[in-house]
Amino acid sequence: MGNLKSVGQEPGPPCGLGLGLGFGLCGKQGPASPAPEPSWAPAPATPQAPDHSPAPSSPTLTRPPEGPKFPRVKNWELGSITYDTLCAQSQQDGPCTPRRCLGSLVLPRKLQTRPSQGPPPAEQLLSQARDFINQYYSSIKRSGSQAHEERLQEVEAEVASTGTYHLRESELVFGAKQAWRNAPRCVGRIQWGKLQVFDARDCSSAQEMFTYICNHIKYATNRGNLRLSAITVFPQRTPGRGDFRIWNTQLVRYAGYRQQDGSVRGDPANVEITELCIQHGWSPGNGRFDVLPLLLQAPDEAPELFVLPPELVLEVPLEHPTLEWFAALGLRWYALPAVSNMLLEIGGLEFPAAPFSGWYMSTEIGTRNLCDPHRYNILEDVAVCMDLDTRTTSSMWKDKAAVEINLAVLHSFQPPKVTIVDHHAATVSFMKHLENEQKARGGCPADWAWIVPPISGSLTPVFHQEMVNYVLSPAFRYQPDPWKGSAAKGAGITRKKTFKEVANAVKISASLMGTLMAKRVKATILYASETGRAQSYAQQLGRLFRKAFDPRVLCMDEYDVVSLEHEALVLVVTSTFGNGDPPENGESFAAALMEMSGPYNSSPRPEQHRSYKIRFNSVSCSDPLVSSWRRKRKESSNTDSAGALGTLRFCVFGLGSRAYPHFCAFARAVDTRLEELGGERLGQLGQGGELRGQGEGFRGWGEGASRNAASCETFCVGEEAKAAAQDIFSPKRSWKRQRYRLSTQAEGLQLLPGLIHVHRRKMFQATVLSVENLQSSKSTRATILVRLDTAGQEGLQYQPGDHISPHPPPRSSHRPGQGGPRVAPFSERPLMPRTPPPGGPPPSWVRDPRLPPCTLRQALTFFLDITSPPSPRLLRLLSTLAEEPSEQQELETLSQDPRRYEEWKWFRCPTLLEVLEQFPSVALPAPLLLTQLPLLQPRYYSVSSAPSAHPGEVHLTVAVLALDTSRLCSPLHPAEVVKSGGVWGDKGGLTEGVLARAPSFRLPPDPYVPCILVGPGTGIAPFRGFWQERLHDIESKGLQRAAPTLVFGCRCSQLDHLYRDEVQDAQERGVFGRVLTAFSREPDSPKTYVQDILRTELAAEVHRVLCLERGHMFVCGDVTMATSVLQTVPRILATEGGMELDEAGDVIGVLRDQQRYHEDIFGLTLRTQEVTSRIRTQSFSLQERHLRGAVPWAFDPPGPDTPGP
């Protein structure tokens, strides 16, 4: 953005990257035309962007049809012609008249904004307000919506009752960005979308103003790596009250001391403000580069003097790369240009104090500030040192000296890595901005006299570009100096302050800086979850950031994605559902995020038009589309266009299962998409998978996010965030005996309300009707059919293909409290943990809301997970409770050595009880169990019935797996478990459950669309509901439907051929056309899997159904099978359809986009050892990469957040 130049004391047209913001509406023209051409013409139907192809010097104009006349704008270098239609929106006349052009005036009097003597007419204010509100709602694509109409009515009512109105924060941000976008004199507007807006409208005193300004300077300077642009907006002008004003023209300026001989030491442009500072108590030095203090004025009060802390002002000594004597000149300049005396107008509201900053264009320092005769005027001194002949202008000594001074400026800013841009790069970026604006708005206001830099005029592309100058609103406007005329109200000279008073003011400001900054830096934490785990983590994150920010925690479906453009900090915690899809409450957010446009993805390639689900399932670092725009972003600079989310800082944590092919796909996609849209990532993506310590991963990621240098230093709250992270995530905070106590409760546990309380989801109760083993009695394994009676509850109304998450009470052969481990004695009275409130006195105990009142046995049975291996964090807590030193040392080692922990966990798969048996000296107090054990997580199963065939019932197909943890998790004979009903209890028992919709796994509504169903093992579960529904339609309604093909797979026809009789009966009654079964362990037969059946017997049908008949394919089963099928189908399509394999892969993408290739994948399988061994290998690989710094956080959670049959 650059030196947003104010001109109150600087006559002449200063140039550069500044918001010089003049409004001479008839600016200088470019080179003379070789032949007269009309400068005004009827506008074409659609504004045309500049054509950058070479053209003759005198192009032939094709006259558009008659219509409204707009200025024709020509580029004399390229010969391209456009029409500026945006100028029709200008509502203010310029200073020029038919007989005179005032375009070269620096400060046209007509365009200055002076304080009015009374409130503006209500109708005038309403007209401007309506126009702005319309602009805002059009920008967010909500024009004409109910919210738009309600906001207009709200503004009208406020103006009618108070004479003014107030902007919402999002409107203020939009208005400030538009004001910069509309500034005709600024050459750096291509970054207008990245303006960081600090809302200081709650400021009430000059002291608070100074604190906000210090924060602004600290943020914008950023240790030399200057922020793109920032503005702090103080309270608006209010009728009957004085204004907030900053008397200085810029926040950082050098003093100018008038000498007795009339000369000036320092910067002559600042003599007047220097004298005012001295009158208000400043004790000046006498140097050429003394930083001026600030004069700040609150309404109806005298201005107050504030000295900027020296460490806040970054200065750059100037030296030349080849001229060694240049450094001896003692020249220097400050790094941050920040204009502070201009007025911001938005929708008729005026903000007289709105300092804004950017970075310098080199010519602003090297040519204007140092070489102008009315400034430092060093040109001749440098020329003499260069031995140039200054006696004649034909020696070009001025040009030679000016170039070397500019070269010195650019060179000096490079070693300390202070942001600066040369005038060639700046003007090229402005041409790109003109092109962007012509496409987006039909034009761009520009003042040619200010856009063309002060040197290299015709060597820059802007010199050859005609421009149209006009005024749009919102806008930055000039205003009279506050000590002149009527603006000087309350500006009397205050007594001279002592040095001690000034020093105390600086000290107080420094102490308030972080506090006030934290109050105004908002953080938005978004979550999307199916089980509530991501929500729980988001709430923990909210508690962490509450001490340093102003956070709000929202579910994605409660958040308006439009607000992303105005956010400063967003943290996302989300799970991944199904096949890499967003959870249900993240669907709308995902779709809206994909619809937003970014600066690096404007290519019209067909990949851009794919649906968000395809992008989310394919987005990765290896995606060529992602790699392309990421490369462009790395090559971009401050002169390139900003994205829609240019001011956003973000960080993402994902939950999922590493057993799935699209592990954390939604989180990865959100992370990638936010960066693609221009956001700045504050930390690497954190990932938590099903089979590793999710809590540890999240804590590490949360601490990293809060302590991250970019996150904290950006918002000036580093120490507060670090302290908060230590307080929230410290193991010492997690458990202290004195912080917890148990109290007995009169009420007993009601299980259903208790589960709803714990899982924060609506749940329903059902009765177990029967539990039937579907496998042969000779089988060493078991699969059961569970029938549940729902009693017709509305919350359990389902469709075939949906999922349900039951909560059967877990059975264990070793219950706590029955000998063995040292666990606190079980009380059969309901207990409630209590803890002191934050900041409250120790006697003031409050209920811990984690669990409902229940006995310890009930908590361990229904709510807490005692079967998963304890996390390193829990082992660390156990080490503090071990009485035997050797056991304490071993537990500490396991908790701190990731590789030792993984070896121990994967070899033993120990439950909590087995850990206590291994370390018998650990004595567990009951409060620790109730407050520190992880919650028992539900698992989702595909519904195996159709409501039309079994009203009031839900059927589930469940594979029962028993594990011997002392023998590397090998399956054991589960017959005893099945005979006793397994974990489901006996007939008539109660179970609680949650219904989850699966709208993407449903039979097509057209009964004549052909389908292929692929489901080995328990993957047949949802298909049972499909054939029951089809059978009911055939027999009860007489509907004839296309008969799908079923491909089933099992080990042996005599042992585990699930539902064989039902399938055969359904085929005989016309439900299935073909049924094929793959046997992987059939005696005297080769191993055959479902993908082999597809390849050898159904290849032609697969191609015909998917490519020719627009049919559907459904795949349900474990992740290994689903991956194999997904690899097989493209090969079939390539072979049968005569296409390349890449093309066939694209076809699968299209099928998914059209929801014709459906997957229902689950992670836990009967091949437990195979899958877990593979994931274990991945885990160790990730650990090694983490130790090398390649993967910051990649941990797996102990509980699933994805569904499965």
Swiss-Prot record:
Residues noted as binding Zn(2+) in the record, renumbered to the chain: 96, 101
One GO MF term attached to the UniProt entry: nitric-oxide synthase activity
Location of region: Interaction with NOSIP: 100-489
Regulation: Stimulated by calcium/calmodulin. Inhibited by NOSIP and NOSTRIN.
Positions that bind NADP(+): 781, 1018, 1051, 1080-1081, 1087, 1089, 1091
Record-listed (6R)-L-erythro-5,6,7,8-tetrahydrobiopterin binding positions: 104, 368, 449-450, 463
InterPro entries: CysJ-like_FAD-binding, FAD-bd_FR_type, Flavdoxin-like, Flavodoxin/NO_synth, Flavoprot_Pyr_Nucl_cyt_Rdtase, Flavoprotein-like_sf, FNR_nucleotide-bd, NADPH_Cyt_P450_Rdtase_alpha
Residues holding L-arginine: 250, 359-360, 364, 369
One term under GO cellular component: Golgi apparatus
Cofactor: heme b; FAD; FMN; (6R)-L-erythro-5,6,7,8-tetrahydrobiopterin
Organism: Ovis aries (Sheep)
Location, primary (coarse class): membrane
Protein name: Nitric oxide synthase 3
Cellular compartment(s): Membrane, Caveola; Cytoplasm, Cytoskeleton; Golgi apparatus; Cell membrane
Catalytic activity: 2 L-arginine + 3 NADPH + 4 O2 + H(+) = 2 L-citrulline + 2 nitric oxide + 3 NADP(+) + 4 H2O
Reported function: Produces nitric oxide (NO) which is implicated in vascular smooth muscle relaxation through a cGMP-mediated signal transduction pathway. NO mediates vascular endothelial growth factor (VEGF)-induced angiogenesis in coronary vessels and promotes blood clotting through the activation of platelets.
Positions carrying Phosphothreonine: 498, 1177
Annotated keywords: Calcium, Calmodulin-binding, Cell membrane, Cytoplasm, Cytoskeleton, FAD, Flavoprotein, FMN, Golgi apparatus, Heme, Iron, Membrane, Metal-binding, NADP, Oxidoreductase, Phosphoprotein, Zinc
